[in-house]
């Protein structure tokens, strides 16, 4: 049972292992959220077989886990299908490290127009290409807030001057 004032959050990440900073960030953040105030759904790939899964601890804490395909195209289709039937999220927190995340951000905006979309960069991967420059504009068009695991990660995925904007913050990979 969740009270009417509970905020609904969709967290989108890559998988349930704890091999990298992204997974550790997601695990630490979600284990420290008050699940009486925040109803969290984690949309995430399965844990790689050679890693320990964070699923048991997260589920025990009250996080709902939606396990999705590892294939990128199948994952995007699954996200679209989920958002078509779950339009009531207050916040969508999308961990991203790719150009394809920009149009996915646009899809999230269309399917959940009232949600605040937080995009979170975890990558600095030169060289900068024209496609990345276009992705910067798309992210900035559709997202409400921007996080980077560092300023360089924010600039790489969201644009050269994103850190000068008031809706950008650094969120280190440890909570």
Which residues does each predicted region cover?
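Membrane-interface segments of envelope glycosyltransferases acting on lipid-linked substrates or membrane lipids
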Residues: 2-175
């Amino acid at each position: 049972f969740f009270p009417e004032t509970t905020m609904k959050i969709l967290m989108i990440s890559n998988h349930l292992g704890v091999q990298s900073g992204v997974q550790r960030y997601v695990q630490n953040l979600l284990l420290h959220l008050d699940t009486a105030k925040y109803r969290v759904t984690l949309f995430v790939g399965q844990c790689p077989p050679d890693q320990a899964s964070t699923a048991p601890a997260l589920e025990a804490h009250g996080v709902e886990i939606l396990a999705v395909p590892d294939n990128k195209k199948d994952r995007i289709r699954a996200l679209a299908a989920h958002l078509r039937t779950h339009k009531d999220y207050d916040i969508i927190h999308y961990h991203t490290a790719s150009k394809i995340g920009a149009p996915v951000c646009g899809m999230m905006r269309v399917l959940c127009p009232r949600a605040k979309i937080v995009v979170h960069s975890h990558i600095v991967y030169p060289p900068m290409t024209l496609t990345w420059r276009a992705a910067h504009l798309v992210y900035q068009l559709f997202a409400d807030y921007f996080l980077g695991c560092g300023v360089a990660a924010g600039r790489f995925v969201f644009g050269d001057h994103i850190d000068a904007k008031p809706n950008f913050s650094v969120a280190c990979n440890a909570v």
